[in-house]
Amino acid sequence: MTQVTEPREEYTHYLPDVERNRAAVAGEREVKRAGVKFLPPLASMCCDTSYDDQNGMTIINQQSGLTLEGQAAYTKYKALASFYGATGRTIDGLVGLIFSKEAVCELPAIVDYLKENADSKGNTLRSLAKKASTEAFIAPRSGLLVARPSTPQGASQLDVEMNNLRPKILHYKYESIINWDYEVINNVEKLSLVILKEQVTKRRGFKVECEDQYRVLELIDGVYHQSLYNDSGALVEEVMPVIINGNMSDEIPFYFIEVGAENKSVMNDLVDMNFHHYQVSADYNSKNHFSSFIIWYETGAQQGQNMLMGNGVKWSNVSSDATF
């Protein structure tokens, strides 16, 4: 039986694309921190040599990863590469254009508080919209959940305020929406399942740790239910219908945000070109770096002490007649 923590195959397939896009948006520091994930090493960096005494031959051994000497060479190779933050700058500019003017926002008085505190975390409705717009450029899908605790029939506005029962709008990124499904109910296709991976903090003294939990939204016999599981898949909160003013809902109040082609971010092509330039710059800058030094060539030399080569090096002559 599939565990609640097991993601949908489609989610797993496109997750690397989203991670790649996020790194490009974050910029050079994040890209370089990922190392070989975005900048493959040269073949020579994964090779070492050994000497075959029996045949008098030097053997080149290919390793699965960087060798000790290769690690030092790769560090230099990566440092010389340049990643220009074209993707991040483009998204910042486009989102800036979208929100260059204040939107007209007309809300009923009972939910007017959403303008200043849309998600119960102090984020304004405008700020939440900007986050959702930014995410729409990065990932093929994200979503908004209209979250509201169950409220009994006849609950007053004072009850809602005093018991933290206000509705709120929560934004979930691609990585958090691990599973979903649709069903045809009364000749209409409806969202029948959403599994959301959430992170909560647990404080033990002064130590704060993050733990995963899984919120399940589903239609059972046409009624909206919620349940909660911990990171090991154990049930934490029983499956219960969500009651609003004493009434049950027949739909899941979760709304997908999907822009562009199916399962493709609108920024994918720009991201791919951004990484292509990054990898080309690594080769080009590395070539320039090593070819910029003098190449010494010596003939007629006899076996003797090795000499250090490079800038900042002085060769000393043991002769008393030496000059420099």
Residue ranges and their predicted role:
Residues 1-169:
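Extended, helix-rich architectural segments
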Residues 18-35, 84-90, 128-138, 215-218, ...:
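Charged, low-complexity, helix-prone segments enriched in Lys/Glu/Asp/Gln
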Residues 25, 125-134, 162-167, 176-184, ...:
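Intrinsically disordered, low-complexity boundary segments flanking structured domains
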Residues 57, 66, 224, 235-237, ...:
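Tryptophan-centered short beta-strand motifs
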Residues 121-125, 171-174, 273-276:
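A short linear-motif detector with a strong N-terminal bias
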Residues 136-257:
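Extended, regular secondary-structure scaffolds
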Residues 234-324:
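Extended, charged amphipathic alpha-helical segments
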